[in-house]
Amino acid sequence: MRQSALIVTVAVIALIAGMGVRGLISAPMNQSSQTPLPEFSLPDLSGKQHSLSEWQGRVRVINFWATWCPPCLKEMPEFTALQSQYSDKGLQFLGIALDDPEPVKEFIATHKINYPILMGQDQGTKIAHDLGNLVDTVPFTVIVNKKGQIVKRQMGELTGEQLMEIVTPLLQEK
């Protein structure tokens, strides 16, 4: 009887801990106040440095991803479609790959990505952490308004529908 009680207790604790970790990873990180996006620069696949200020004045969706991450790869076709549809309205996607360059080059060669992909590697992981990705998970997405303020941080997959609920009002701001 004692052993059964111990097993049940351990199972309940494991269940509660698992739910807490799952909630931390999959739940959107809501932020009540907008904070400025820190400036940083990263290279593209050709080695050319790009600063975030290149896209100042646009609503930016900054997505940290990796080629080995199934949810990351699932998001990308929707992001590509939304970039095509809303680019002229002020939306700009930026992908920050947390991979080595070779797998990223291979991925880009076989997929039609229509937004800039920057190479984050180790520096990208630190930047994601500084932006609020405290558990170093991918995908991790940061949404920035036209004024350069972070309005949303999302750990885990983000659907096009969820994204547009956040982005649509931002695109209408002056």
Model regions: which residues?
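N-terminal targeting signals for export/organelle localization
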Residues: 1-41, 174
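A short beta-strand-turn-helix
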Residues: 39-60, 86, 128
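Conserved hydrophobic/aromatic "anchor" residues
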Residues: 40, 64-65, 107, 115
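Conserved redox-active cysteine motifs that mediate thiol-disulfide chemistry
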Residues: 56, 64-81
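Short pre-active-site segment immediately N-terminal to redox-active cysteine/selenocysteine motifs
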Residues: 58-60, 64-68, 100, 137
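Structural microenvironment flanking redox-active thiols in thiol-disulfide oxidoreductases
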Residues: 73-112, 122-129
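Thiol/disulfide oxidoreductase modules built on the thioredoxin-like
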Residues: 109-113, 120-168
